[in-house]
Amino acid sequence: MLAPKKQKFRKAHKGRVASTAKAGTTLAFGSFGLKSIDGWRVTARQIEAGRKAATRCMKRQGRLWIRIFPDVPVSKKPAEVRMGKGKGSPEFFAVRVSPGRIMFEIEGVEENVALRALELASAKLPVRTRIVRRYE
């Protein structure tokens, strides 16, 4: 799973998702991409599940790019613990995905295979998405 090698701080504020994405809104590598419609927090496990689903559908042909990286530590308190006594330890990493952000890109497979792979990947993600394509 994706996680940062080093962090400046162990715990992060909860934060909010930005209104619309300022960068990463256009296709940079592939011919087909998965673009978010909602803003939400996507975990490293969800990204990995989407990657596995897409590569399995592509039968390991072509190329898949992951354009988001989980860099925000999310902390959680254990089950059945009373309120207070600190924030809790970091459990997993997530990324705040803004509306309009490209999350996955695909190149090197037929159109119907790419569309099916991105549909399968989008089913694993908590955000609503749409598939975009490059017009040349």
UniProtKB/Swiss-Prot annotation:
Protein's name in the database: Large ribosomal subunit protein uL16
GO-annotated molecular function: rRNA binding; structural constituent of ribosome; tRNA binding
Keywords: Ribonucleoprotein, Ribosomal protein, RNA-binding, rRNA-binding, tRNA-binding
Organism ancestry: Bacteria, Pseudomonadati, Pseudomonadota, Alphaproteobacteria, Rickettsiales
Physiological role: Binds 23S rRNA and is also seen to make contacts with the A and possibly P site tRNAs.
Stored CDD domains: Ribosomal_L16_L10e (cd01433)
Organism of this sequence: Rickettsia peacockii (strain Rustic)
Any Pfam family: Ribosomal_L16
Quaternary state and interactors: Part of the 50S ribosomal subunit.
GO cellular component: cytosolic large ribosomal subunit
GO biological process terms, semicolon-separated: translation
Family designation: Belongs to the universal ribosomal protein uL16 family.
Entries under InterPro entries matching the protein: Ribosomal_uL16, Ribosomal_uL16_bact-type, Ribosomal_uL16_CS, Ribosomal_uL16_dom, Ribosomal_uL16_sf
